[in-house]
Amino acid sequence: MNDSQRVSILSEALPYIQSFSGRKIVIKYGGSVMENDNLKNAFFRDIALLSTVGVCPIVIHGGGPEINNWLKKLEISPKFENGLRITDQKTMEIVEMVLMGRVNKQIVKGINKTGSLAVGISGLDGNLIQSRELGDGSHGLVGEVTKINPEILDPLISKGYIPIISSIGSTLEGISHNINADFVAGEIAAAINAEKLILLTDTQGILKEKDNKNSLVEKTNLKEARDFIDKKIVTEGMIPKTECCIRALAQGVKAAHIIDGRIEHSLLLEIFTNSGIGTMIVA
C-alpha cells in the first residue's frame, strides 16, 4: 500500500469517525479471533483505535475453547446438547475461573498494552447481568438474561475506560449462570442504547446460499432477517446469532452486524468503510 492509498483510506473513514464519536458500540469477541495471536493483536489494536477516535467500545466475551482446554486438564469431559454446554456445579466453577480470571484478564492486558485503558468485569459485578436457568433447567447452570443493570458501566465509559465483560450472570440469590455471550452482548447493547451491536464470528455473515461465498447479504432489515430464519436460509449456529441481532434491534439498537473475525481488522473495515465486510441488519 502506498501513501496515496493510506490517505484515501483515512479520508473515507473520516465521516464515520465523526458520526460515531461519543457513541457506544457493543462488540462480542469470540471464535477463531480468540485463538490466533495475529487476530488477537489486531483486535486489541482495533479496540484501542476506536477508543482513541472517540468511539465508546464495550467488549463482551465468551471463551469456549479455553474452557474446554481446562476441563480436559482437570480430566473432565465437556458435554454439549443442542450446542449448549451441560454445566453442573463443578463445571460452573471452572467456567467462572477461566472466563473471569483468565480470558477476561488476557483481553484487558492485550488492550492495555496498546496504550488504551481496559477494565475487566463480569456480569456479577454490580449485578450487571441478572439471570435464571435456561428453559427447564436440563442444561444445569446454563442461564438466560432476565435483567441488565448497566449503572456500573456509566462511570467507566464516561472516564474513557473500555469495559471488558465476561458472560457470567447470577440470580439475586447468588447462583451463577453460564450465558451465551452473543445474547449477553445483545441485551447489554439494548440496555445502554448502543449505536451498534457487532458479533465477531467464524463466518462471513448471512449467506443466501450456505456454501456460496458470493451470496453474502451485505445489508438487510428486521423483516427479512426473520424471513431468513423461517425459510431456513439461516441455519444451525447462525440462528441464535441472527435472533440475538433481531432482539437487540427490536429493543432500540440502531444496527447489528455479523462479521468475519477471521479477517484482520474486520472490525474497522465494517465500521469505517463504505462497503463494510459482513452483514448489517437494521430496523
From Swiss-Prot:
Coiled-coil segments: none
Pathway: Amino-acid biosynthesis; L-arginine biosynthesis; N(2)-acetyl-L-ornithine from L-glutamate: step 2/4
CDD domains: AAK_NAGK-C (cd04250)
Keyword Kinase: yes
Cellular localisation: Cytoplasm
Gene Ontology MF terms in the entry: acetylglutamate kinase activity; ATP binding
Site location (Transition state stabilizer): K28, K241
One GO cellular component, as annotated: cytoplasm
Chain positions recorded as substrate binding sites: G63, G64, R85, N178
GO terms (BP aspect): arginine biosynthetic process via ornithine; L-arginine biosynthetic process
Swiss-Prot/TrEMBL catalytic activity: N-acetyl-L-glutamate + ATP = N-acetyl-L-glutamyl 5-phosphate + ADP
Similarity comment: family membership: Belongs to the acetylglutamate kinase family. ArgB subfamily.
Protein name as annotated: Acetylglutamate kinase
